[in-house]
Structures are given as C-alpha cells and as structure tokens.
C-alpha cells in the first residue's frame, strides 16, 4: 500500500507551482545557458528525412542506426504504454536538454544512481519497485525490441548480452534500464552512460503528433518516428528532436517514447560489490528468498563515456536510395549516380533536379526573435493566480496529467475505505446536481458553452461539501493534520483538474463550461472559511455543516490511526536483495501472440548486413519536365497586389541573390536537352506528355511536373503511370510552399508568410518552367498525392524554390 500512496503523494505535492516558477528573466537566462551546451536543431538543419525502414551508415560504412517501421505489435506497445506513461514525471535532472525547463521524463528497470544523492546504489528504480506487480506488462515490448536488435546488429547484441550482469536484466534481455519520455523535445545530446560495445534502441509506444523527428545532428539526417516504430542506434552520436509541427498553440498532441539500454555502470566493480553485500545480508536472513545463490562477475568492456567518432557523409538523393530497405534492388545503381553527383562542380544535379543540391545565398533564415522557444510547449507562462492554485501553464499541464490519482482505483490504496466512500458519494452528488443544472441551461439555449454558477444553489452547497471531503483526502495523503500553503496549492490544482475532466468526459459538457479558472474562483470562496455565504445561512444549516466537517475529519483520523500500526516499505531505504523478483514467463502462445524471435525474423527480412557497393553496369535515368504552354519565356512582370509586393515577407523572400538569379535565368524547359551519357549513366529527357514508348528506366525524375497539375486527382494518376516505365526509384521534385522553418515561427508570422508565399513561388515557377499558375503545395499536400510509399525526402539546401526531392518505391 505504501508504494502507491508514496507515488500519489509525490505526484500531487511535488510539481511546479506559481511560487516555484522562475521569473521571465530567469527563464530566458536559463534557456540561453542550456542552449550553449545543448542546442536544439530544427528541421531546416537536416538534409534528409527518412520515412521508411532503412540502415543509416556513416562515411566509413559504420552503422549509425537501423530504422524499422511498424515493427512492434500493437498489443505490446499498448500494454507497455499503459504502465510506463506514469513513469514520465516533471524532472529537473534533464532540464539542460529541454532549454532549462523540467521535461516529463523518468527511468525504469535498474539504475546505478552513481553521482546521485540516493544513498543505496545499483538497484531497482523507484518506478519498478512501486509497480512490481504490474511490471510484467512491459515484458513483451522489451522482448520484441531485444530480438529485433539481435537480428539487425547481432555482434553488438552479443557483446552487450555478454557484459550485462544477469541480476539487472529486464526479462532476460541485454537491457537494464528504460528511459521514458513524454512530450519531450530533446536538445542535442549523447547518452553517455550507455554501454560502449552495444547499441541502444528507441521505440515510440504511443502518440498522436507530427514532427519531433529523431535527428542525428552531425550527419544532418532526421528519422521521423511514429507509434510502433523502432530505431536501433549508436546513442553516443549527438542526437536530438526536430520541432513539433502544429498549426496553433491549442492543438492537442501526445508522444510517448521508450529508450532501451544497458547502463554500463551497473557492470562496474562498485556495483558488483553492492550486489554481493545485499546477497550476503539476504543469506543471513531466514525470511529472505534471494533468486540466486551467487553473483557472477562478467567482463564489462572499456566504457569511455565519450561521443562516438564522426565520419561525415555527403548525402545526395541517390545515396539515400542505398540506405532504404525497400529500394535495395536498385541500391548499387543509385550509388553509381551518387558518386557522379558527389564530384565537385558536377553539373549532374542541375540536369536532374533543375538546381544544385546546395545554395549558400538562398532564402535567408529567420532571426531568433521570430521563432518560438524550442521548448515552448513545455514552458510555463507567467503566473496569474486568482484563487486556490497557480494558473501557470506548467502547473495546469501537470495537474491535468495527475488528475487520474483522485479516481477510486488510486485512492483506494491510499486512504481508508470510510473516507473513500465519503469522497465517492460527495463527488457523485455534486456531479449529479451539475448535470441537472446543465440540462436545464441547454434546454433553453442549446448552443450554450458556459456554465452559470449559482452561488446559493444546492449545487454550490454540494461543491463546498465536496471540498471539505477533498481537504481531508489531502491530509490523509500527507499523513498530517495541516498542509503547507504550497501543498494546498498543489492539491487543489489536481482537484480542479479532476473535476474539470469529470464534467467534460462524464457529463459531456464543453471544455470551457466548467473551466479550471471557474473552479479556481470557487476554491477561493472555499478557502475563505468554507464559503463567503456561510453567515447568511440558517443556524440549523450552519450547525449541520460544522457537524459534517467534524465527521469527515474523524474519518480521516481513524484512517491515520489504523495505518500507524502497519509495516511500511520505503524505496529510499529498501536494502533487500530483491533483484529479479519481478521476473516471470510470458505466455505468447496462450495469448495468440507472435513469438519474439519469429516476429523479429519477419520484420527484419529486408535488412541487409553488408553495405552495398556502386555498380559498373549501365544506369538509365529519365528526367521529365513540364511542357511549357508556349514557346515564350514565362513572364516575371505579372501584376501583383501592392499589399503583397510591399509586405515585409515579400521583401525578405525577394532579397535572396539566388532568387534574383532564378528570375534572370533562362527558362529551364524551353527546349529539351539532348540525351547524353555521363560515364555509365545514360540521361534521357522528355516532356511530361510525351514519355518514351516501350522503354523502361532504372530511375525517373519528375522535375516540378506535379506543380503544373492543379487537380490532385490528375497528379495522382500521373504518378501511378510511372510504374510502367520505372523499375527502381521514382524521384518527385517539387516546391514545398511552407518554408523549412515554418513550424518554428511565431503564429502571426506564419500568417504573414502564408499571405505571400503562393504568389512568390508561382512567380519563380513562371520564370523557370513557364507554368502560368503553379499549384505549389505543402509537404502534407504533396505527400497525399502519392499512391506509392514515400520512403524519404531530400531537401535541397538553400534552394530559392524551396525544392524537395521525394523518393518513392513503386511497389
């Protein structure tokens, strides 16, 4: 009972409050300081976004990471996320990786606690200790990830498996520890405590979000991850998350990830000494039942706790082909083209994509003051306390997350049955009266969204009675007669969030009807002696309330007296040899689940251990351009509204020297270039409406063809037809109408950009391809056109047309 009570107490009484929130100046200084050591990297800093399963390699062919899409069974991620979501709590320990703010993060499994004020080292984490009976819910997830790791990186898995002490394994795997992150955009960092001889794994186990790709900062490669995806990677490379992609600050999203690793300090001599000390004590205790009779020490390798050496890569769109599992059949030919593209001053990129792969004087990047703080979603707003608790964003966000702890299932393990029954009945009574009042209000005004609180109504009386019960619940959780002001503020914020959620979810009221602010005002009434209307009540009612309050207090005191006689276990002082007491078998067959080893074999079937070499065979490439509507060059002198051409955003876009070169250059598709050979690569050119007949190509490049097709259905049909002529990868080259920094910008600035961007890119398309009114689309709109799997995106750096190359597998 104590572990659950301790967890509730920690979560309710230990989180940011208005008094604890630093000033705006202090937060700004902390943000700047954090970024010096751990900068954030946005999408604009990367060149490649890898969407599909792939093996990423560095400049010497060493594996950076292996990405596998939808590789985890849904039952495993669902079961694990249901338990592990509670492990991610506000912690200042990782604030340096979150711009100085406390992110939602936590650890589970076993941990060394080296350098920590925790006295007892090398043991179960508090989370696993307190959730030992439920801990097996994570075993299927851990088993599947381990077998996938073993399949794709067998030598590293074996080294890790040989080094990890058996008593700190999670369900027999080579993982000792899990790190759980919720809504946490990490700044650039390495995982210094992970075992040097192995790899770590990360899985997204729950979420509904866009963006937040895992980026390998030194390689300029992003890996967007979604639920059930797994990445086996060298965590000693610097990595971070790109920006969250939301359209407005109120947009709902969630993201829960889990990192699996062997914490190498658990295999050092000091940890083995701790294991043996505990085991010796257990063997002298007749009541103890250790699961092993001895501790076998293993070689732990040499762990330097330093970043891995970086051997840079010079990616091109064709090099990406060689990394993608789905395109392995054309990888060797892709590398042949890549090697020609990588030659300094090679004209091949312009022939294929219409421009160079990189441009140093393209559209200028944004100033820092034009961008949102990288941790904006987790940062707290200024405190505007107006009642029983602070209304800072940090407090309200945390309170909503913890409101579940006032449900019956949680409280039943923390307070007496008598006090719990009072809480349940008082809450039910108040909700019943709220429902009655709300039904009456919407009967006369169906569109109503605000709840009119009547201060002398039975509902108001029931609310204050519920507050009296809640106050005793709070004191029962604290095990004392009075709470500090800070403890009260913390509890009342959770209490209000709990009632707000109950009204929204159970009574189906609009979110704003029973708002947190409204409840806060009423809690202020309660804090002023119970209610400011008490003196106006009849004497009999006043006496009834006093007696009711006394009975609730007595129920809580009886609960406290009963608990004083119970033996309690405390994680901080737990010195037992309780390693592996949580372990048990998983009945995969009984549940009808795939056996992890066989499942891993299936989901890794397309993974190839050896790096591919470039072929010497002939490579056929077709470049398709939009046919110009006439033989005349596109007219740049098109009349545009003055409010567009004089806007700050238009002036900024037009200030680029690269943009001015596009406007002055010859139209790219007035005539077709003659077919030619560049070493082993045969280049063929065609207009979009006169493709070669009865010919097939290894690669086809559609150069801004879809922007000449305003109808989405026509564009999709055109892409579908490419299957008949392309045997390898289809490259779709298009403008992304949203700039690369779009989702980092302050929202008003996005509106200003949106007002001019379509006209700006239409102007460039008229000059470059003669397209009268190009249909420039957003990333999401372009990708929605594809009837095939989009495996990756290659972003031409500094491109004046914001050009992106999409790699499609024509399966």
Swiss-Prot record:
The record marks 525 as: Involved in J base recognition, conferring specificity towards J-DNA. Belongs to the TET family. JBP1 subfamily. Binds 1 Fe(2+) ion per subunit. Its EC number is 1.14.11.6. Monomer. Binds to DNA as a monomer. This is Thymine dioxygenase JBP1. The DNA-binding JBP1 domain (DB-JBP1) is necessary and sufficient for binding to J-DNA. Fe cation binds at residues 189, 191, 239. One of its GO terms (biological process) is base J metabolic process.
């Amino acid at each position: 009972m104590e572990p659950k009570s301790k967890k509730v107490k920690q979560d309710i009484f230990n989180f940011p409050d208005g008094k604890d929130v630093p000033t705006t100046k202090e937060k700004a200084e902390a943000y700047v300081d954090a970024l010096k050591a751990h900068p954030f990297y946005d999408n604009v800093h990367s060149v490649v976004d890898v969407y599909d399963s792939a093996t990423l390699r560095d400049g010497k062919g060493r594996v950076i990471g292996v990405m596998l899409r939808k590789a985890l069974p849904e039952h495993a991620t669902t079961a694990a996320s249901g338990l592990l979501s509670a492990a991610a709590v506000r912690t200042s320990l990782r604030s340096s990786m979150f711009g100085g703010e406390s992110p939602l993060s936590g650890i589970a499994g076993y941990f060394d606690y080296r350098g920590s004020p925790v006295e007892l080292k090398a043991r179960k984490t508090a989370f696993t200790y307190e959730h030992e009976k439920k801990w097996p819910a994570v075993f299927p997830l851990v088993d599947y990830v381990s077998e996938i790791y073993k399949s794709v990186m067998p030598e590293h898995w074996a080294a890790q498996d040989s080094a990890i002490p058996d008593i700190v394994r999670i369900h027999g795997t080579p993982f000792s520890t899990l790190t759980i992150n919720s809504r946490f955009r990490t700044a650039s960092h390495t995982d210094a405590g992970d075992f040097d001889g192995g790899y770590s794994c990360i899985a997204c186990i729950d979420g509904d979000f866009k963006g937040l790709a895992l980026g390998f900062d030194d390689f300029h490669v992003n890996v967007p991850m979604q639920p059930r995806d797994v990445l086996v990677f060298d965590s000693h490379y610097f990595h971070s998350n790109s920006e969250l992609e939301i359209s407005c600050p109120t947009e709902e999203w969630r993201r829960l990830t889990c990192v699996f690793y062997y914490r190498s300090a658990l295999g050092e001599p000091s940890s083995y000494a701790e294991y043996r000390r505990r085991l010796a004590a257990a063997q002298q205790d007749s009541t103890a039942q250790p699961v092993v009779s001895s501790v076998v020490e293993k070689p732990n390798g040499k762990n330097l706790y330093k970043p891995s050496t970086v051997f840079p890569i010079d990616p091109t769109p064709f090099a990406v082909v060689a990394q993608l599992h789905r395109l392995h059949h054309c990888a060797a030919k892709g590398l042949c083209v890549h090697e020609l593209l990588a030659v300094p001053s090679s004209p091949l990129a312009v022939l294929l994509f219409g421009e160079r792969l990189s441009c140093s004087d393209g559209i200028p990047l944004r100033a820092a003051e034009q961008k949102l703080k990288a941790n904006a979603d987790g940062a707290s707003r200024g405190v505007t306390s107006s009642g029983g608790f602070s209304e800072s964003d940090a407090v309200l966000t945390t309170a909503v997350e913890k409101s579940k702890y006032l449900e019956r299932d949680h409280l039943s393990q923390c307070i007496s049955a008598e006090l719990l029954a009072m809480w349940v009945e008082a809450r039910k009574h108040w909700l019943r009266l709220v429902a009655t009042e709300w039904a009456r209000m919407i009967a006369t005004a169906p569109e109503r969204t605000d709840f009119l609180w009547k201060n002398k109504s039975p509902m108001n009386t029931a609310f204050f009675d519920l507050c009296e019960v809640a106050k005793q619940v709070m004191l029962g959780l604290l095990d004392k007669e009075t709470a500090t002001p800070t403890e009260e503020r913390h509890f009342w914020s959770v209490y209000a969030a709990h009632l707000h959620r109950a009204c929204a979810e159970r009574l189906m009221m609009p979110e704003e009807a029973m708002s947190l602010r409204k409840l806060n005002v009423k809690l202020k009434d309660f804090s002023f002696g119970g209610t400011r209307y008490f003196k106006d009540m009849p004497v009999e009612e006043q006496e009834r309330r006093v007696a009711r309050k006394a009975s609730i207090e007595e129920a809580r005191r009886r609960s406290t007296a009963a608990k004083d006689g119970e033996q309690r276990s405390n994680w901080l002082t737990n010195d037992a040899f309780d390693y592996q007491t949580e372990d048990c078998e998983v009945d995969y067959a009984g549940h009808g689940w795939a056996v992890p080893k066989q499942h891993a074999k299936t989901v890794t079937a397309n993974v190839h251990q050896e790096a591919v070499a470039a072929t010497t065979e002939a490579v056929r490439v077709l470049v398709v351009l939009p046919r110009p509507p006439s033989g005349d060059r596109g007219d740049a002198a098109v009349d545009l509204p003055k409010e567009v051409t004089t806007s700050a955003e238009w002036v900024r876009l037009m200030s680029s020297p690269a943009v001015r070169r596009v406007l002055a250059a010859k139209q790219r598709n007035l005539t077709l270039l003659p077919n030619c050979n560049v070493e082993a690569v045969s280049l063929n050119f065609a207009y979009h409406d006169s493709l070669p007949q009865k010919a097939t190509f290894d690669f086809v490049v559609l150069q801004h063809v879809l922007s000449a097709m305003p109808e989405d259905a026509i564009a999709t049909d055109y892409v579908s037809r490419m299957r008949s002529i392309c045997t390898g990868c289809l490259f779709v080259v298009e403008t992304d109408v949203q700039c690369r920094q779009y989702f980092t910008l302050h929202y008003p600035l996005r509106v200003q950009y949106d007002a001019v961007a379509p006209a700006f890119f239409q102007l460039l398309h008229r000059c470059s391809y003669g397209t009268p009114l190009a249909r420039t689309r957003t990333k999401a709109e372009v990708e929605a056109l594809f009837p095939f799997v989009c495996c990756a995106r290659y972003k031409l750096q500094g491109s004046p047309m914001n050009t992106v190359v999409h790699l499609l597998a024509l399966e």
